[in-house]
Amino acid sequence: MAALRVCARQGEASARLTRSIRTAKVPGLGACVQTFLGWIDGDPSHEAAVLRALGASGQQDAREELGLGSLRDSFADTFFPGLSTIQTRARYFFFVQWCCELAARRSAEDGILTALHRHEVELISALSHLGQGKGVIGIDSQDRLRRMPSDIYWSGLMRLGMRQAEGSPVHWARGVVAARETERQSPGREGEAAIESTFGFDSDRPRMPDNFPNLPALDFGLTTDEARTLRRRLAGACADRDGRLHQHNLMSVFMTHRRALPRGMSLWDHPMVPALQSETQQLLQLARAFTEVMYGAGILYRRTVARLSLPEGGQLDRYEGYAAGLQDWANALRPADVHLVLDHIDEAGRLGFATRHTISPETLAFVKAWAALCRAGPDLPASEAAAELVSRREVALKGRAGTSRIRLASARSRWRGGEAQRLDYRWGTAHQYLNDLASVR
């Protein structure tokens, strides 16, 4: 396997997230305590880190028991820049811009944000006729939704070049007001018209439909103009600022296949994979091998917790299910995947520099140690060394926080089990977007 040429930045950029608690007045509710995650204005990488944290909160494969998130996200950002696991349908990239356009016509910062919330609630209501399972964000919560579409798509809009205004929605609203005031104080200039047309977003965005979002038949069907714009933006997106990772943007090649993909098709089976550049195919092969090899570590972790739970009233059938699943995985594991991870995981680690993810030496050491043990093949489930390695890793990550299920019975008592999931690098979102686009010629 040829060496992968990956742009490596000097130093690792850690995501500086802030968690705050404040009291705010909510119309109709009075004073409420709100807990929120924020990011540093003007730094898109911090925005992306917040949304990754939000996306991980409800996903089985993103619990971070074994600390593989930085490697996973490095692959995902490289293959599918601008996408996230909490996005649902492609047309939201335009819905959010249009809601912001409507809201930005207000004259004050707080008025803009209040109007944005109102328009997004109207959007939820307008789409609710589509029913469950169609990707409608907030269909159950409606106006009680805590994570609006603008929060979910904000970072992606920047990555795709569809948002020019940097920073959070608050920073954007502040910028709209400031720009409008500047133009008003400049006699003889016609800049306000430009502000009114862009509002910090793509000046070439498709025109907002009349009466949006209050349309009786609003749905996720893209118009020809919307599909053309989105294809161009998705194809041009890149995970690093230097553009060296652009060759690994899978959407640029996958979108040339203008047919709907069947449900359940894996990333590895996309019909355009053979058309990828050689280096991209090699990187994709490494990502697949990493998924298959580390999947077993997730099963072993669950088997270990289930075994420790047995004297505490845990379910025997749960333990036996994990044990059987681990053996099935070990029997099917391909030695070629093990060797690929052992030989090339450092190259994947260098993606972290380019995509601004912190991949610690401890993470790479754990992956290498696990892969080395995987050479035992079908005998691995009986390996005490493998169980000890996985247990030590979880304790190292969670022990100080008091959430280690290996160490604490109290943490095990709150455990609901669940199946280990293979990493898919946001393929679920990409699969849906490709089908959204395939229906438009």
Task: Kindly give the residue locations of the regions a language model identified.
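Short polybasic linear motifs
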Residues: 15
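Non-catalytic recognition/regulatory regions in large multidomain proteins
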Residues: 18, 22, 26-441
